[in-house]
């Protein structure tokens, strides 16, 4: 892997991990349309850890608050919200492997992501969500968690689904986004742990270590930038802007699928 490839892959992962456009969906699209090979597993794990650093930097105040008061309501909400994704990853992941080979699945899922983003914005403007952590119920956390679990389908954005679910549930706009990003921490850590055994097998070539440093660093920087962009758009009620992007990419994806 070259340094340029590492930079591009890190940037794409950092941006699409947090922008509501589906990182897994874009990976499938790039592999099919641009014939880009899937990166080595070790690189993939390290890049995901780079995005984890971005979350820690962006939300350190929230994380530090949880560490100081681990039994606060936000902690319990995050635990409850992670349960559906944990069950889905453990029980259903093998059944979704073929979805990562299908442009049709990605195209349809991107259409659904766009609809979800647009719908949530319209609903949130009608009921003016004001729920902060203390007012958010465990049923709200489960609902958000279920949407996160469904994002195992490539093309269905994890960040988009969880933010949209929070808005639909009546959460305060900024808290909905913060909760979504904090909810990504256990998911990213869990995915990294799940792949660690294979990482020890593949390893890193001693003469090719620089790309494995540049990739995660790039992912962290672009991931932090993406988080700030999403937070700003959510505050201003402009999340639905990404709906149009998802629909355009979905149209291109389905067109390419029909050509095949």
Swiss-Prot record:
Its EC number is 3.6.1.27. InterPro entries: UppP. The chain crosses the membrane at residues 40-60, 76-96, 99-119, 181-201, 213-233, 239-259. It is found in: Cell membrane. GO terms for biological process: cell wall organization; peptidoglycan biosynthetic process; regulation of cell shape; response to antibiotic. It is a multi-pass membrane protein. Pfam families: BacA (PF02673). It catalyses: di-trans,octa-cis-undecaprenyl diphosphate + H2O = di-trans,octa-cis-undecaprenyl phosphate + phosphate + H(+). One of its GO terms (cellular component) is plasma membrane. One of its GO terms (molecular function) is undecaprenyl-diphosphatase activity. Keywords: Antibiotic resistance, Cell membrane, Cell shape, Cell wall biogenesis/degradation, Hydrolase, Membrane, Peptidoglycan synthesis, Transmembrane, Transmembrane helix. Its main location: membrane. HAMAP family: Undec_diphosphatase. Catalyzes the dephosphorylation of undecaprenyl diphosphate (UPP). Confers resistance to bacitracin. Belongs to the UppP family. Bacitracin is thought to be involved in the inhibition of peptidoglycan synthesis by sequestering undecaprenyl diphosphate, thereby reducing the pool of lipid carrier available. This is Undecaprenyl-diphosphatase. The gene is uppP.
């Amino acid at each position: 892997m070259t340094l340029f490839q590492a930079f591009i892959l890190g940037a794409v992962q950092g941006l699409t991990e947090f922008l509501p456009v589906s990182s897994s969906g874009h990976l499938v699209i790039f592999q099919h349309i641009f014939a880009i090979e899937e990166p080595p597993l070790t690189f993939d794990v390290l890049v995901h850890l780079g995005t984890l650093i971005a979350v820690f930097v962006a939300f350190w105040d929230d994380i530090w608050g949880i560490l100081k008061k681990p039994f606060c309501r936000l902690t319990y909400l995050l635990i409850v919200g992670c349960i559906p994704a944990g069950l889905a990853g453990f029980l259903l992941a093998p059944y979704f492997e073929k979805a990562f080979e299908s442009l049709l699945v990605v195209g349809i899922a991107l259409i659904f992501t766009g609809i979800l983003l647009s719908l949530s914005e319209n609903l949130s403007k009608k009921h003016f969500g004001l729920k902060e952590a203390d007012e958010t119920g465990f049923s709200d956390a489960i609902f958000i968690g279920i949407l996160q679990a469904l994002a195992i389908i490539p093309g269905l954005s994890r960040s988009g689904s969880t933010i949209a679910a929070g808005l639909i549930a009546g959460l305060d706009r900024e808290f909905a986004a913060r909760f979504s990003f904090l909810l990504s921490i256990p998911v990213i850590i869990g995915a990294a742990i799940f792949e660690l055994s294979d990482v020890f097998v593949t390893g890193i070539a001693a003469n090719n270590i620089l790309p494995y440093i540049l990739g995660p660093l790039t992912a962290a920087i672009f991931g932090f930038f993406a988080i700030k962009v999403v937070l700003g758009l959510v505050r201003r009620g402009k999340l639905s802007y990404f709906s149009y992007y998802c629909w355009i990419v979905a149209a291109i994806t389905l067109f390419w699928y029909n050509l095949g």
